[in-house]
Amino acid sequence: MPTNFAEILNNCVESINSFLWGPYFLITLLCGTGLFFTIKLGFVQIFKFKMGLKELFGNFSLHGEAAGKAGMSQFQAVATAIAAQVGTGNLVGATTALIMGGPGAIFWMWCAAFLGMATNFAEICLAQIYRTKDDSGHTIGGPAFYISRGLKGKLAKILAGFFAIAIIIALGFIGNMVQANSISDGFKGAFGIPQWITGAFLAIVCAVIFIGGVKAIARVAEKIVPIMALLYVGVGLTIIFLNFQQIPEAVSLIFRAAFDPSAAWGGATGASIAAAMRYGIARGLFSNEAGMGSTPHAHAAANVKHPVDQAVLGIMSVFVDTFIVLNITVFVVLTANVISFENGKAVFTGITLVQEAFSSHIFGKVGGYSFVAICLFFFAFTTILGWYYFAEINVRYLLGAKAVRAFQILVVVFVFLGSLQKVDFVWSLADMFNGLMVVPNLIAIIILSPIVAKLLKDHDAGKEYDVKDYLK
């Protein structure tokens, strides 16, 4: 029997998560929606992949369309989206999935990400179509806007409001506590810096950037994201290459454990196929955010000639997040052979497991721990900025620009507090609110799917874009 309020609350959250992330609800809904859009849009994630690469690398070198006074450039938008996607989910989330769901969880991450590319494409198309300007003249958009403006009626406004509240709590407050805690833990382990000092530094830097608004966030994202991704991927590939003999076994283990979890580490994890699916898809969502309705907020602000030009970058952002950055973490850990168990429990978990893996070659103990802590800082810090921006848009949707300053103060406080607290329970809360965000978003994009299909068909036919052709 639960003996205190905290235990009762924890049990309630776990019960909700068991339903949301069990084998029958969100996993089916997310994968089903991804499959639906994959078929309806003609495997858009495959046939528009080349276009996505061209847009991504063309914008990387040329910085794409000009930002304009009210929005972002195409490159700034995708950089902000990737900044939000590439965070602790790519390090801590990946290792949590490995330990709790076994290596088979990675297979389900891949499946969910492949299908999620089509879902993300649809989200971004709708975010571009239904975007608007707020009372300060900013170009804003996202699920709350395409739910309320696309579906219409009282129920649509209720669903939009529910989504807006869920994302403010999930990303603005709870999610950013998780990111801040990961940074403070990493710096304490690597450099011995007290958590309150890291928390205070984070809070001050975030406050300065928040005050600068969307332009400041976009400028930081477009400068940091390419550097941090290339650095992490480059070092990770070096370690994987040094352990190249282990690659075939690592790949084999992922596929075997997806359908027979006992194939991994003598069954020490105790994971089931259901657990592999749950942790793979849930942690995958926390990482790539496809279907969650978060990254469309960044893409909605992009200044592009046609929504499809931006939507293909949504395909690429999921690809970069899961199939490149997250896979680097997975294969560094698996090929370094640092996973071990004592009495049924993993010896190393979370960020420590990643640090041990990076310590196995090149750096040594001190260098490995320090390198991962620095990478984690940039990953998690840019995620805080991206998630703050997504949540702020929904504050503007619900309460208007007048409420933004109070929201900024609250987020800064939560960032500081998150640096100090143990966040095992907060991870569970994040799973719950992420799940609650998914439901209204997926309902809306499925109902509005004919608009996405028409938009893609018109684009492929070379028809000039006019938003009035798609507004219901």
Stretches found by the model and what they are:
Residues 8-9, 41-45, 90-94, 171-183, ...:
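Transmembrane helix-loop junctions in multi-pass membrane proteins
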